[in-house]
Amino acid sequence: MAALGMGPGAEFDLLRRIFARLGDAAPSDPLGDDCALFKLGGTTLAVSIDSSLEGVHFRRDWLDFMEIGYRSAAAALSDLAADGADAIGLLVSLGVPRADGQEHAAEEIMAGVAQCAQNVGASVLGGDLVRFDRYMLDICVIGSVQRPVRRAGASEGDGVWVTGYLGGAGLALEQLRAGTRPPTALRNRYACPELRLQAGRWLATHGATAMIDISDGLAADAEHLSAASDVGIEINLEQLPRWEGVDALAAAASGEEFELLLTMPPHFSDASVSTFRGDTGVELTRIGVCLRGGGGRRGGVRLLKDRESVTLPPGYDHFRQ
């Protein structure tokens, strides 16, 4: 079985044990990337699946039903962005509880899914509808990709870059948990995240060597890139682009940002950054560098603040005790 290119954590330790039991059913390509890739004629398809569960990924007192559908679809489609893929379609398994006075909930949720799909030129291809003890969506996304970018391609000397601004989703979540309604723009960062599919395609065609979407938090997802590519990653916290009112360490820990963390060759220039911004309307910031890997002293991820190492903030882990 191919190696599982993931960083540390209880969730990923469990995945390693699960994949070790797959035997001949395991794929030959490395497991643990954002999408599975396979050829269909002359087309390379990118496929991924993502779950959103009430009480874990969303709460009904924070989001309306359309937002629940939109956010769930965005989380799934973001995996396609991380591979540089175009979105084709979605399959949705929707679980709804028994009558709770919300007779139009399923329609509203699916309207939100459809709106998110339409925004990236994708279709809702079908799915399944079941009774469940709470609201739940499993969304399978299908895309096509010309130049896939995986987590395993970074090399020593590559620059580490990130799209957009970090920390907004975490700040919005903090305010929602405190019972405060965030300002509209900040709330939308959590409720209706912007997708980076166009940015992912641009980066893929302009030489990105490795890429991942930020779902568990910048620091945690950098560990996945480091493990998959067998390089060290050094990130300068002072360089992190972040929302107003968010400190650098909080920005590095904020999950479900759905921005792209990526590596580019050393020759990627300021002129290329300007072209990217002009073509996509998205910010792109260099935040660090890839260092020697292969078991060397500089493997793993190191965060620097004022040139001093700081403790990595933990990313989200479904199975942490």
Question: Regions from the language model: what does each represent?
Answer:
Residues 1-64, 83, 92, 116, ...:
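Extreme N-terminal cap/leader segments of soluble proteins
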Residues 65-91, 108-119, 220-225:
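Small-aliphatic-rich amphipathic alpha-helix that forms the alpha element of a beta-alpha
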Residues 170-187:
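Short, compositionally biased
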Residues 190-194, 273-321:
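Acidic, Ser/Thr/Pro-rich beta/coil linker or hinge segments at domain junctions
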